[in-house]
């Protein structure tokens, strides 16, 4: 909100005097300060420090009071041809739900963050594969949004025009609304396999720059932004610690984490191979944010049944975890993460997931919150 210009001066014209203004009842996020000398234009002004202090109200979005969203990344290539039942759906929601015997309330999908891509691509995929479930409610859509350039280029504004166009398209899609988008931009930034790792300072600048554009275009009030590192920083240096990449509570709605045992080429100590231990780092980043396993699953480097048991022990051991997403596929580097690759582990998953705590539907209270936020963001 606009405020009247205020002039600060001191008797000598050159002391270290501080000016102070109380805007305790002004709701704003951005502050613009224009500094102008009262003397002639040739007078030099020496500004030592400017501080703006205040409180930011940052409430939590779409957190179920009881339970945890049951999610997955279920690509068709995660199923052998003979198990696809003739399906050609690249997002094999129906096959995965049949496999585990329970419906999903959250689906993960991916798109590169680069010029030439647009939101309508994802909205079309969303309409085809997420749709409505059998009780007339939507599944949540978790959107892995992957940059292909280093963070310094993003921090310098190289993607500004792309983000403006993209978020304007998101804001215009409310007529085709299917619930809020859960943006998960530039995940696993503390892992050396991403093109945007290793530069925490510019990562924070890039994230805030992207978020500010989204906010100014009316996207942040309704949708969700998930900040999501890898559970283990690689390399494990202090400079590459996940906390260094955190853009701050006021720029993040949920904390996410990629939760896997070591790859075939990596070496972890035994106690860092399983979910309950791997979750410890993300909890230290922010004290209050809700947490999700934004992708995870076992591999050939761990005991599959122990992994599944710990996955479901999150209910009692880690109550801040309010969503879990199983990544159901295999690759050469990480081994076979598919639930169906181990019949005993699959049967254990099918048994434990039947607990109503693992939500197959979005709760009514969350739907009410969705409608309220949607109406307030118009």
Protein language model features and the residues they cover:
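Aromatic, loop-rich ligand-recognition surfaces of beta-strand-rich domains
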Residues: 1, 14-58
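Glycoside hydrolase catalytic-domain groove-lining segments
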Residues: 120-144, 254, 260-302
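N-terminal substrate-binding region of glycoside hydrolase catalytic domains
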Residues: 59-163, 298, 325
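Substrate-binding cleft of extracellular glycoside hydrolase catalytic domains
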Residues: 112-229, 327, 349, 369-373
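Aromatic-lined carbohydrate-recognition surfaces of secreted/lumenal glycan-active proteins
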Residues: 211-240, 288-301, 323-329
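Substrate-binding cleft of secreted/luminal carbohydrate-active enzymes
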Residues: 64-82, 181, 290-377
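Alpha-helical scaffolding within the catalytic cores
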Residues: 87-96, 117-131, 162-171, 231-247, ...
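Aromatic- and acid-rich polysaccharide-binding/catalytic face
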Residues: 102-114, 242-270, 327-329
């Amino acid at each position: 909100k606009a405020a009247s210009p205020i002039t600060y001066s001191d008797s000598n014209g050159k002391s270290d005097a501080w000016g102070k203004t109380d805007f305790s009842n002004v709701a704003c996020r951005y502050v613009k300060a224009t500094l102008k000398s009262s003397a002639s234009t040739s007078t030099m002004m020496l500004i030592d420090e400017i501080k703006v202090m205040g409180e930011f109200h940052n409430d939590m979005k779409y957190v179920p009071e009881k339970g945890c969203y049951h999610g997955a990344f279920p690509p068709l290539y995660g199923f052998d041809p003979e198990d696809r039942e003739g399906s050609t759906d690249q997002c094999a929601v129906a096959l995965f739900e049949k496999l585990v015997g329970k419906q999903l309330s959250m689906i993960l999908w991916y798109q590169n963050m680069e010029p030439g891509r647009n939101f309508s691509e994802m909205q079309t995929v969303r309409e085809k594969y997420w749709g409505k479930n059998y009780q007339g409610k939507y599944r949540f859509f978790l959107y892995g949004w992957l940059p292909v350039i280093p963070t310094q280029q993003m921090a310098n504004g190289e993607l500004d025009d792309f983000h403006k166009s993209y978020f304007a398209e998101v804001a215009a899609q409310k007529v085709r609304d299917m619930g809020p988008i859960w943006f998960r931009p530039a995940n696993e930034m503390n892992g050396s396999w991403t093109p945007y790792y290793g530069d925490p300072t510019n990562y924070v600048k890039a994230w805030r720059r992207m978020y500010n554009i989204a906010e100014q275009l009316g996207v942040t009030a309704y949708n969700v932004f998930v900040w999501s590192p890898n559970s283990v920083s690689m390399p494990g240096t202090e400079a590459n610690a996940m906390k260094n990449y955190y853009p701050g509570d006021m720029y993040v709605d949920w904390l996410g984490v990629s939760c896997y045992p070591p790859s075939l080429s990596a070496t972890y100590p035994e106690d860092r191979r399983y979910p309950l231990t791997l979750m410890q780092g993300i909890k230290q980043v922010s004290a209050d944010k809700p947490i999700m396993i934004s992708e995870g699953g076992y591999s050939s480097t761990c005991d599959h049944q122990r992994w599944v048991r710990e996955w479901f022990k999150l209910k009692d051991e880690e109550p801040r975890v309010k969503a879990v997403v199983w990544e159901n596929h295999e690759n050469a580097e990480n081994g076979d993460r598919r639930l169906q690759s181990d019949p005993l582990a699959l049967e254990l998953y099918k048994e434990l997931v039947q607990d109503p705590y693992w939500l197959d539907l979005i709760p009514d209270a969350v739907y009410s919150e969705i409608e309220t936020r949607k109406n307030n963001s118009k």
